[in-house]
Amino acid sequence: MDIIKKLSRSIREYKMVSIMTPVCIVFEVIFEILIPFMMANMIDSGISSGNESALVKYGTLLILCVMAGLVFGILSGGLCATASAGFAKNLRKDMYYKIQEYSFANIDKFSSSSIVTRLTTDVTNVQNAYMMIIRIAVRAPFMLIFALIAAFMTSTKLSLIFLIAIPVLGIGLYIIVSRSHIYFERVFKIYDNLNEVVEENLTGMRVVKSFVREDFEEKKFTKVSEAIYKMFLKAEGIVAYNMPLMQFCIYSCMLFLCWFGARMIITSGATTLTTGELTSLIAYAMTILNCLMMLSMVMVMINMARASAERIVEILDEESTLHNCDNPEDKVNDGSIQFDNVSFSYIDDKEKECLKNINLNIPSGSTLGIIGGTGSGKSSLVQLIPRLYDVTEGSVKIGGADVRDIDIYTLRNEVAMVLQKNVLFSGTIKENLRWGNKEATDEEIIHACELAQADPFVQTFPKKYNTYIEQGGTNVSGGQKQRLCIARALLKKPKILILDDSTSAVDTKTDALIRKAFKDEIPDTTKIIIAQRISSVQDADCIIVMEGGKIDGCGTHEQLLKENAIYKEIYESQTKGDEQ
């Protein structure tokens, strides 16, 4: 019930349409139930008695019932489609908006392939189930109840067969649903793996081709596809028993009614049961059993959708690990940064801390260089500044205020970060750059690109800043992508600029030009540069050396060459490589 309550919030403006669907269905059912009654009267009062006026009367009423049922059926179908499609639209929107609220820690819990599956396949399953619930799950019970009443009014004795058939079907359906649900849960988890394989293959197609690993990728895809096939086979193998069980009950009931009904007509001389009544009873029997069949289909669909609904609610229930305090500050005073005894872990485990007791002061407008090996905690350190994660212990202060006391939107608006993985979106270069500032003028865009050394190569494109960037930026080089991302960050005009190894694909000459532009054009901005090349940070006001989540050394280029063994080793290895 809790899942239903949470999902029902997404109905919203489609609530009235969802209510009107069952209302139309009730009228549709009433007119359909009257049809066998009219047929019985046509046979007994019209055809058997040779009464033409009765035949015309009941024939006309029969046609009117059919037409009325058809009209209400069309209305209910249209309303149902509108309600279910609208519900699915709102559900996807609610999930997507919820994901936008996630912190990095929340996002780390779900793979992108899993989120895509939940937004597409799972929502479609829930949409189909909702459609069946407000239409068939309403229609079938009403039809069943009215048909049972009409059948018992026609012949109580013969209708007793339904009291045997219905429990048999109910027990069988319960067993089928409970056993198949386990496999449906598993199959949707495997769908996540399938999407992951497809996503990795498509985004890494150039790597696959360059290493001639097509066969390996095909085998990997086939393996996951086979797993889905086998799991679905198990689930559908159980569900497949539903139809034979239904048919057995239907044919058994029909045989019983025809045999004993015919005997009653013959033995009683049509005083206990007439031919018309037997005809209507058979029609009611078909209606009752078809309703049971529809209900069984609904139960199977709901069973499948239940697994999807649980996965959707996981997304909706996930609360962001980052929240504003009660009265957050709406201003960042300056670009000074202070780390006070900061420790940090991606998981709540003190033994697996990736940052330990970090103490660091970065004056506003200064340039800090960060050097260190892979996994030393460089990226983790800078991700705490815009509060992408919260510290485990200690505090990070910007402009003298704890980042947890500053409004998240305000904080991130004053910190521009170019991540290790450079991301460009589908659209023109100009549209991508305006992610940094949607109000940026063409002159501001060009100026930012000049600082990032992106303008020279953009001018070589036929459409220049209106050049379309393919998905993932596949039609620009790695270095070009990095420079566009730096330009985008500069358009924010931030108080703090963080480059997380963002010039690794840029040649040393261009790298030097970018650093010179920063020094000359944005002297008041605090600049943090993570790099593998010492040449990228040697002009910084201060350089820190990270090792094992700790600051191993801190000072200028000259100081670290004299005092820090790790820095000296990196410098010597790079200078020897340059000499060779």
What is the predicted role of each segment?
Residues I3, R12, S18-L75, L79, ...:
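Transmembrane helix-loop-helix hairpins at lipid-water interfaces of multipass membrane proteins
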Residues M16-S18, C65-S84, R135-F142, L163-I190, ...:
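Alpha-helical transmembrane segments of multi-pass membrane proteins
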Residues S49, A85, K93-V123, E196-K220, ...:
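Short intracellular "coupling" helices and adjacent cytoplasmic loop segments at the cytosolic face
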Residues K331-Q580:
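ABC-type nucleotide-binding domain
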